[in-house]
């Protein structure tokens, strides 16, 4: 019975862990050695000082390769690290303002939004209302529409201006190149 406290590790099928009656073996150079028993393949791998690694379990018969497992594992980890470096998750950056914003402040917000969009992030443009300002929601909509037209070359509107509580917001996403 397996120990429930210790998580079962998914050990790679190499050398003695390969439990099939017959396997197709590929040499370290890529040449096929044919269909042989795992014991014969292990002897060949031991002679060369290499490991027998299960490559494809689903094939009939399963495919194994003679290689240096430590080097193979290192290469796989290196590829995974490189892939992780290259992927960029699109964050949602927020640009907040009031509907009575001055021109210079508005330009600062536009430049912020452009910088976020160039970095590949989505932008949430929010207009906050205080007190009775909520009566002027049409002015906030005009402001967000103006922002959308000013950013038309850099962004697509993901969600049109919409009022939510004491805020009006719009989502912009970077244009696909």
Swiss-Prot record:
One of its GO terms (molecular function) is translation initiation factor activity. SUPFAM superfamilies: Translation initiation factor IF3, C-terminal domain, Translation initiation factor IF3, N-terminal domain. This is Translation initiation factor IF-3. Its main location: cytoplasm. Keywords: Cytoplasm, Initiation factor, Protein biosynthesis. Belongs to the IF-3 family. It comes from the Bacteria. IF-3 binds to the 30S ribosomal subunit and shifts the equilibrium between 70S ribosomes and their 50S and 30S subunits in favor of the free subunits, thus enhancing the availability of 30S subunits on which protein synthesis initiation begins. PROSITE patterns: IF3 (PS00938). GO terms for biological process: ribosome disassembly. Pfam families: IF3_C, IF3_N. Monomer. InterPro entries: T_IF-3_C_sf, T_IF-3_N_sf, Translation_initiation_fac3_CS, Translation_initiation_fac_3, Translation_initiation_fac_3_C, Translation_initiation_fac_3_N. It is found in: Cytoplasm. One of its GO terms (cellular component) is cytosol. It comes from Synechocystis sp. (strain ATCC 27184 / PCC 6803 / Kazusa).
């Amino acid at each position: 019975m397996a120990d429930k406290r210790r998580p079962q590790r998914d050990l790679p099928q190499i050398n003695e862990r390969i439990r099939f009656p017959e396997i197709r073996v590929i040499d370290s150079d890529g040449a096929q050695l044919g269909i042989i028993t795992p014991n014969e393949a292990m002897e060949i791998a031991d002679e060369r000082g290499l490991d027998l690694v299960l490559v494809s379990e689903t094939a009939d018969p399963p495919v194994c390769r003679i290689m240096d497992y430590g080097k193979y594992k290192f290469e796989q980890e290196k590829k995974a690290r490189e892939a992780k470096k290259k992927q960029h998750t699109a964050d949602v950056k927020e640009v907040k303002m009031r509907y009575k914003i001055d021109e210079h402040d508005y330009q600062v917000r536009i430049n912020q939004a452009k910088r976020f969009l160039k970095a590949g992030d989505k932008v949430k443009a929010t207009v906050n209302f205080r007190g009775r300002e909520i009566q002027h929601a049409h002015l906030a909509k005009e402001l967000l529409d103006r922002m959308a037209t000013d950013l038309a070359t850099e962004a697509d509107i993901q969600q049109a201006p919409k009022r939510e509580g004491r805020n009006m917001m719009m989502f912009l996403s970077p244009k696909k190149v």
